[in-house]
């Protein structure tokens, strides 16, 4: 029995978001298990997997040999191994790359479409979940595994939760919150991730950027002390030789259309406009504003003015909830 995604409604900014239950159908789950799973992942992703605690989750990058990200992954321990969450548009292609050397290790890597991904966000999200689970994650324990359910805590843009669980539990949560929460689809979670500065890598932007171009280092997702992994040389060079000239930015404003992932924007230069950047994600809110996540040069002036190509409206830089200072 499958879990049906909720019908879409216009996303709401975090500051005004009522209690909302979100079906995360644009995200997908994979599991990595087996005796060698930790060691195998250690050679494939940017973070120090051996240091990943039982109550932690981390946004890490999986790179090609040139240091470009196939994908980023929300990685955590689950049951007897690891689980990761990434965008559905590239999960299967990314897993093909991740499995390339698995034949030499005791490791099983599989896409998991049996379990359900749900988000709980908005006004009094914690209170809404309190009676449904014995323990909820928080700043001290951002991950709680409770039977078949993994609960992940996010601080930004406001406290919210991501649930990885079976269909029966997803149905139970849905029924418990029916009438109390509004329901929405992945676009609402996408809007919150843009506000939080959490990079969105969809298929169109796979193998285009080194991790630092999307701020993964600022989110604690790169270890510069661990042993080698695929793409490490290029990732290290970007740090120690200052080779990375790009960063992830959060823009907001108006636009007559929502830009698509992979397209560029335009930067105002005096009386003219110059193409710049690559859009990772964008969404239009219920109040008409457009939020855009974009990779651009890391030396942009804070008062720079942008627009969707040939548009009459403008976008401006918004603050991120973390520092990019090394």
Curated annotation (Swiss-Prot):
Q: Does the keyword Repressor apply?
A: no
- Which positions form S-S bridges? none
Q: Its GO CC terms?
A: cytoplasm
GO MF annotation, one:
folic acid binding
Annotated residues for binding of folate: 27, 189
Q: What UniProt keywords apply to this chain's record, in alphabetical order?
A: Cytoplasm, Folate-binding, tRNA processing
Question: Which GO biological process annotations does it have?
Answer: iron-sulfur cluster assembly; RNA modification; tRNA processing
- The source's superkingdom equals Bacteria
Q: What is its main location?
A: cytoplasm
Entry's InterPro entries? GCV_T_N, GcvT/YgfZ_C, tRNA-modifying_YgfZ, YgfZ/GcvT, YgfZ/GcvT_CS, YgfZ_barrel
Task: Name its cellular compartments.
Answer: Cytoplasm
Family indicated by similarity: Belongs to the tRNA-modifying YgfZ family.
Role noted for this protein: Folate-binding protein involved in regulating the level of ATP-DnaA and in the modification of some tRNAs. It is probably a key factor in regulatory networks that act via tRNA modification, such as initiation of chromosomal replication.
Question: This protein is called what?
Answer: tRNA-modifying protein YgfZ
Q: Which organism is it from?
A: Enterobacter sp. (strain 638)
């Amino acid at each position: 029995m499958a879990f049906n995604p909720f019908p879409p409604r216009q996303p709401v900014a975090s500051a005004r978001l009522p209690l909302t239950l979100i079906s995360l159908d644009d995200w997908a789950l994979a599991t990595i298990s087996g005796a060698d799973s930790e060691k195998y992942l250690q050679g494939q992703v940017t973070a120090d997997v051996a240091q990943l605690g039982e109550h932690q989750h981390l946004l890490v990058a999986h790179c090609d040999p040139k240091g470009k990200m196939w994908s980023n992954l929300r990685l955590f321990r689950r049951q007897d191994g690891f689980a990761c969450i990434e965008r559905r548009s590239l999960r299967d292609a990314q897993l093909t790359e991740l499995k390339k050397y698995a034949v030499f290790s005791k490791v099983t890597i599989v896409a998991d479409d049996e379990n359900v991904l749900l988000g709980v966000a908005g006004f009094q999200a914690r209170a809404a979940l309190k009676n449904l689970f014995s323990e909820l994650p928080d700043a001290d324990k951002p991950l709680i595994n409770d039977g078949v359910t993994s609960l992940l805590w996010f601080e930004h843009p406001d406290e919210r939760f991501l649930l990885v669980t079976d269909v029966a539990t997803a149905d139970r949560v849905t029924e418990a919150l029916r009438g109390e929460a509004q329901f929405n689809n992945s676009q609402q979670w996408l809007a919150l991730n843009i506000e939080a500065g959490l990079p969105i890598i969809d298929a169109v932007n796979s193998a285009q950027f080194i991790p630092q171009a999307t701020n993964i280092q600022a989110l604690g997702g790169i270890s510069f002390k661990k042993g080698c992994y695929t793409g490490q040389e290029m990732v290290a060079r970007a740090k120690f030789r200052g080779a990375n000239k790009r960063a992830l930015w959060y823009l907001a404003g108006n636009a007559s259309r929502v830009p698509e992932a992979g397209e560029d924007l335009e930067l105002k230069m005096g009386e003219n406009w110059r193409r710049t950047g690559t859009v990772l994600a964008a969404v239009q809110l219920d109040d008409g504003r457009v939020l855009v996540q974009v990779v651009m040069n890391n030396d942009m002036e804070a008062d720079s003015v942008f627009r969707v190509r040939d548009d009459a409206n403008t976008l401006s830089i918004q603050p991120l909830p973390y520092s990019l200072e090394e």
